[in-house]
């Protein structure tokens, strides 16, 4: 009813405008009886895709200088001739020439998505062109799992949610240390996570409208400490020597040293202890007989404790004993050979004299 009154007012002031509005009224759902629609066999339909934030130009041309046009979006009139009915400052009519009656929408948003109709009123019959504007939206990750710290063996689900038009595809990748790709999907399930599966996980949302949106999640996996190696260098009395203990664990383990049942402390009896995240080094600045014995390295964190032992013995004297025995043995054989030689000469001399 309001539209008809508007048309009647337009008739009083401008006959061509009334004609245009009447033709547009046929396109408005509010002007049609329930369950009926109007199909214009002469109407051209076009589809246009524009990225969000860009400028959309919906082309429409007048037949001659006498024809008039109007633009309609769904049930709202945007322009009628040169009169702007929309209050949106982004909307204008492009007039590159006398026949150009294109609708220009700056900084396109998702709310601009939908059908647009250009109606041109000629001297004979109205001509209608329809354009369906599709606003494409670059992918945007709006929700992703926070960085997490969990214990080894726990089930983990990583979440990555994104928006975009077309709807973006979601993919996951374990970028450190393995760079392993996973199947696509918003959720990444890891059952019984292991220490090897710790690191950074990358979520990528992509829909070919723009560059993929990429976010990362850091996963820390706690596990009980292990000692991978305990090893010593040569321990020579009067010189310095060291024992190295290599371990692993998350959180990093705390190291302790024992000699027999006695706990060792840094600076005690010429001992220096240096602890790092994955190793501990025990240095004896001046090795004496009292430093030899059984040493134990202990590594502990909140998930457990482990240890490894190494016997530290004085340098072996076997080398010197073997050398001495050889000298004595050689001397004995030399003596035997000498005595035998003299005996042989003595018997040979007697035989000649006889």
From Swiss-Prot:
The modification Phosphotyrosine is found at residue 187. Its main location: membrane. A lipid is attached at residue 324 (GPI-anchor amidated glycine). The keyword Signal applies. Keywords: Cell adhesion, Cell membrane, Disulfide bond, Glycoprotein, GPI-anchor, Immunoglobulin domain, Lipoprotein, Membrane, Phosphoprotein, Repeat, Signal. Residues 38-134, 139-221, 225-313 form the Ig-like C2-type domain. One of its GO terms (biological process) is cell adhesion. Residues 325-354 form a propeptide. Glycans are attached at residues 73, 155, 275, 286, 294, 307. Disulfide bonds join 60-118, 160-203, 245-297. One of its GO terms (cellular component) is plasma membrane. The keyword Disulfide bond applies. PROSITE patterns: IG_LIKE. Residues 1-37 form the signal peptide. Belongs to the immunoglobulin superfamily. IgLON family. May be involved in cell-adhesion. May function as a trans-neural growth-promoting factor in regenerative axon sprouting in the mammalian brain. This is Neuronal growth regulator 1. It comes from Pongo abelii.
């Amino acid at each position: 009813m309001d539209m008809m009154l508007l048309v009647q007012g337009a008739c009083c002031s401008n006959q061509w405008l009334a004609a245009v509005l009447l033709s547009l009224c046929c396109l408005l759902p509010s002007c049609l009886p329930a369950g009926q629609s109007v199909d214009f066999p002469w109407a051209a339909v076009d589809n246009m895709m524009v990225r969000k934030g860009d400028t959309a130009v919906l082309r429409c041309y007048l037949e001659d200088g006498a024809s008039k046009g109007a633009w309609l979006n769904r049930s709202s009139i945007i322009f009628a001739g040169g009169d702007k009915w929309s209050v949106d400052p982004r909307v204008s009519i492009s007039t590159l020439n006398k026949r150009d009656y294109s609708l220009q929408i700056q900084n396109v948003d998702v709310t601009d998505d939908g059908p647009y109709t250009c109606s041109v009123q000629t001297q004979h019959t109205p001509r209608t062109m329809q354009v369906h504007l599709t606003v494409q939206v670059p992918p945007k990750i709006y929700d992703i799992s926070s960085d997490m710290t969990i214990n080894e063996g726990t089930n983990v689900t990583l979440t990555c949610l994104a928006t975009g038009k077309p709807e973006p595809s979601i993919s996951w990748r374990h970028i450190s240390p393995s760079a392993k790709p996973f199947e696509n999907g918003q959720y990444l399930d890891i059952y019984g996570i292991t220490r090897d599966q710790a690191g950074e996980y990358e979520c990528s949302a992509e829909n070919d409208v723009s560059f993929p949106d990429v976010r990362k999640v850091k996963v820390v996996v706690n596990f009980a400490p292990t000692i991978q190696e305990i090893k010593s260098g040569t321990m020579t009395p009067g010189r310095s020597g060291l024992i190295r203990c290599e371990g692993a664990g998350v959180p990093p383990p705390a190291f302790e040293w024992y000699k027999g049942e006695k706990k060792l402390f840094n600076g005690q009896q010429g001992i220096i202890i240096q602890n790092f995240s994955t190793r501990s080094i025990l240095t004896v600045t001046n090795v004496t007989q009292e430093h030899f014995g059984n040493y134990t390295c202990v590594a502990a964190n909140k998930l457990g404790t482990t240890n490894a032992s190494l016997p530290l013995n004085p340098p072996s004297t076997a080398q010197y004993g073997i050398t001495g025995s050889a000298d004595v043995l050689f001397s004995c054989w030399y003596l035997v050979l000498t005595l035998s030689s003299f005996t042989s000469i003595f018997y040979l001399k007697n035989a000649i004299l006889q």
